[in-house]
Amino acid sequence: MPLYADIVLPLAQPAYTFAVPEGMHVEAGQAVAVQFGARKFYTGIVWRVHDRRPPFKTVKSIQRVLYGAPLLSAQQMAFWEWVAAYYMCTPGEVMRVGLPSLMKPSGDTEEEFTEEEFRPRTECYVALAPGLHDEGRLHEAFEKLERRAPRQYEALLELASAGDGERIPTGEVARRLLRADYAVLHALERKGYIVSAERERTVERGGSAFRLPELTPAQLAALESLRGQFARKPAALLHGITGSGKTEVYIHLIAEVLARGGDVLLLVPEIALTAQLIERMERIFGSRVTPYHSKLTNRRRTETYLRLNRSQGGEFVVGVRSSIFLPLKRLQLVVVDEEHDASYKQADPAPRYNARDCAVVMARLWGGRTLLGSATPSLETWVNAGSGKYGLASLTERYGDAWPPEIFVSDTIRAAKRGERHAHFNKLLLDKMEAALGRGEQVMLFQNRRGFAPYVECSECGWTARCPHCNVTLTYHKGGGKLVCHYCGYTAPVPVKCPSCKVTDVVPRGFGTEKVEEEIARLFPAARVARLDRDSVTSERAFNAIIADFEARKTDILVGTQMITKGFDFGGVSLVGILNADNLLNNPDFRAAERAFQLMMQVAGRAGRRSDGGEVVIQTSEPGHPVIRQVAAGDYDGMARAQLAEREAFFYPPYARLTLLTLRHRDVALLRRGITELAARLRGRFGRRVLGPMTPPVDRIRGEYLAGLLLKVESGASSARARELLGAELKAFSEDPEFRNITVVVNVDPQ
């Protein structure tokens, strides 16, 4: 009976059916090479095998199977299907992020489509020949070699001393013998003294005896609470103030799972955090720790995926959001550190998934548990914990002898009126910086805007430099002497004359991290100043160098964007300055207050890791703003109550589920007709739950105009039914000849 296979390709298309050649064995989850179109060859994943011939005259056949074993387990396939359904994309789009790029080769001819590049690496291993396990014959070999071939004698002695039957990589032997080369080993093999063989490179997993950190009574209580709650609930929140020692609790739970032979996934929001965390975890768990992030080479990510796919358990992966797609077959625990961080949400391309939410579903599919950790949890997670859907454990005391920082709120308007403001710094902050530097301590300054200035302006006529492709001003980067669009990357030189009125008075306005760095170097000429933002960090090496210098106290003042807020632990920092809290609060987003609170508390936490406390200065023109007061008091509960009351009144998450639809096209008139038509269609289905059409703050990017619609559905309603209805309307819209070329981006649970 002829067989057919539904194949998922890395395209925004549904699965396609191919014939299975006679004699070829394929099964669900396997990778195969197929021809799609006239000449294009792709890697695909077998989704199901059946005997139903599709209604086509010609059915193309699978070219070949690319791996022996399936790349996806049944659980992974169910997870991919959930991601595709929930985030309204295709399994092929999930495949784009779910597999490393070397595992998805494509080419215009079958000859270009080679497996060689993604075969696992092998190493050459050597061992004593079986005959030399007899002591007499081994002694005879030593006597022959000691005078005639001393280097061969030393190599054989080294191998024999490694233990009976021990296999050693040739590279390790060469390192131990310093000047020994492969010729020595080849000579020993020709004489029959050793044997060699190639085998796949593996990672030594080590034992289960870990040197775990001691826990305080508060941490022990939290650990016991989590153990009990995991017996009843699939997920729990560990709510611990900054510096309370959440990581130590993670470590004990991780050790328990690894000791049982289970797999653990520890998610962090930023690549920047992985290096410090991996180093810390390796001190405890050794070679069991496997990093996974985009800064690793394609080859390394592929090797990691293939090794994990063969593993039978006991794996510990530390990685960023894409790590949720790794093949951890015995997954028992997923830890999501800083669960509130918006970096867990993928913006583009599809699937626009939130790794935190996916982790909860993923662990449930595997029968495992999810631990969400944060000092300032997202309000969605906070409500889930408060309602009993998730478990909840709290850490309200700081770990060790650390004291919370003292927070000062400095009014920028009052300081300016009193003549107590110099450049972009109030006198209060400058005085405290001088005192801290005088004591040999370090300072961190946070400004949530990179570049030298947000824009340049003509003082005479008000002209500003704007991007020709996007509806935004160009940011001035003094270091490169150019204007840059942070949306499309367009660059332009700074004009000498105003293009509008020809006056030579074009000046930068506002301030970014570059300008802060320059002004601080002028105000504190003896201080060593460094900057940490996307412009200064051009590579992982550059990032590590900046962090290492600050950690070693080779830098006195570190200026940076959000990158400096993410979980770093610098013992020398006694003062943190938040230079402009206003631009955190004044965003047109219902999450602005929550995000501002979270970010300022994170920044403040960098000064709260000392036995003598620390100090934080918040500069703002609105010292009486409720969020500023809540940050100064460390009042998360107060912030949560106030924001939840507003969300409930205006029907926003967690009391509603949002889906943002963004339409894009170069013809603004066509776009307006399209958005009006789609809004009418959706209102016919959802009524007043549809908001818009809306014009986003940046309504043109890369030459395309943008318009939006927001769908709000009650959190208690069936989200699956809402997606089904929405999908049907979007399909009908895309099939309309007038609007078929309009791009519709679907963003479920936008952040």
Give the label of every model feature segment.
Residues 524-527, 682-690, 735-740:
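Short secondary-structure junctions
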Residues 48-50, 99, 198-200, 447-449, ...:
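A general secondary-structure junction signal
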Residues 210-216, 220-223, 232-672, 680-681, ...:
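Inter-lobe coupling/hinge segments of SF2-like helicase ATPases
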Residues 1-374, 381, 386-402, 685, ...:
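Accessory, non-ATPase domains that flank or precede helicase/AAA+ motor cores in DNA-metabolism machines
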Residues 704-716:
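Short basic, glycine-rich beta-strand/loop surfaces that mediate nucleic-acid
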Residues 680, 684-705, 744, 748-750:
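A carboxyl-terminal module marker
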